[in-house]
Amino acid sequence: MSRGAVRAVFAVPGNIETPTGGYAYARRLIAAGREAGLLLDHWPLPEGFPETSLALLAETERRLSLAPEGWPVLIDGLACGALPPDLIARLPGPVIALCHHPLGLETGLRDDRAARLLEGEAAALEACAGVVTTSRATADLLVERLGVRRAAITVAPPGTDPAEPAHGSGGSAVEILSVGSLTPRKGHDLLIDALAPLAHLDWHLTIAGAGDRDPAFAAALEARIAAAGLGDRVTLVGAVGEAELDALDDRADLFALASR
């Protein structure tokens, strides 16, 4: 890190070591920032977002208010989009939101809940000094659905690590891998529906992803697999670390992405 490095707070709710794409992005952002002369101090925020309570918001403000005067405060969108604008305005430095996906556009939300989340996130982002998104598609959504000024948005897409070609399963059955938490937006139910008519073919599906984000959906997915008679063709391995995910990638013949 150079002597003239910029320092900023990077506030992330929950455990940053959680094996999901969003948290992996946060970890890599911290590492890449250090190499580029931007020292991001990771500050954990309470779990529970985007659901909030008076106690959760009070504790969040207490932590963020400890930021040194004038330091930029980058807040992960899971929390930032749920913060009241007046709380954001009281913080000691400029606030920048990191938005992976608008909170109110999560698949499976009731219409009234989605509308409240979109309204709240629009107000929160308007109070921010800037917004970072992980894709141009998300940037477009923020402009079109939440009224964010395009000039206020910086797009910072994730990269791809170089890797050797996968060895594949080496067996007679085609090994299919799908990765993502067991939530409606990841579309694992669509994948099961697509594979069910292909039971006469020789294949096996492994789904890697946490099942505790939406327990009701995870239970419904397991029931769907059983009802389709695919209990011995589909394996749910839960959340996995990077080494185990690399091993699953290496053994796979096909990768399936069914996100809505």
Map each language-model feature to its residues.
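Membrane-proximal helix-turn-helix segments that form the acceptor-binding/catalytic region
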Residues: 103, 112-131
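Aromatic "clamp/platform" in nucleotide-sugar-dependent glycosyltransferases that forms part
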Residues: 260
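Conserved donor-binding/catalytic core segment of Leloir-type glycosyltransferases
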Residues: 160, 168-186, 192-197, 206-208
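Active-site proximal beta-strand in glycosyltransferases
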Residues: 72-74, 88-106
